[in-house]
Amino acid sequence: MYSGICSCLFLAVLSSSSLGQQISGSQHANPAVTDLEQSLLENHRHTRIPTSGRPIQLVDGSIDQKANLGALLAKYLQQARRGSTGKASVMGLQNFDPTHRIKDRDYMGWMDFGRRSAEEYEYSS
């Protein structure tokens, strides 16, 4: 559910930014201005998003907003995956029973239900 909301938010941001570029490009009637705008847009397309999270400083001194937004979304998604505590959250470890019979063979995150049910029941043969 939470990942669906995040993906919808991400798609909404991408679509609104692309619509904003189309509207601003159609307002200029001068073809020289339109050619200059197209060349600037081509330069933006070849710019990579930095992994450090800092915004990119362009030649004209402006900050690339797409790179800044991409870094912000990447940081947000990493925090959402880690959980609210900042550590990898594992459900059910607080209620772990110390008398559990097969605790040395349990793996974090999954459980073999067939083996567990076979060991819990003692069959009289």
Curated annotation (Swiss-Prot):
Signal peptide (UniProt feature, chain positions): 1-20
Q: Which residues form the propeptide?
A: 21-105, 114-125
Q: Which InterPro entries does the entry link to?
A: CCK-like, Gastrin/CCK, Gastrin/cholecystokinin_CS
Keywords tagged on the record? Amidation, Cleavage on pair of basic residues, Hormone, Hypotensive agent, Secreted, Signal, Sulfation
Biological process (GO) annotations held by this record are:
digestion; regulation of blood pressure
Q: Which GO terms describe its cellular component?
A: axon; extracellular space
Q: Which PANTHER family match?
A: CHOLECYSTOKININ (PTHR10786:SF0)
Protein name, entry field: Cholecystokinin-8
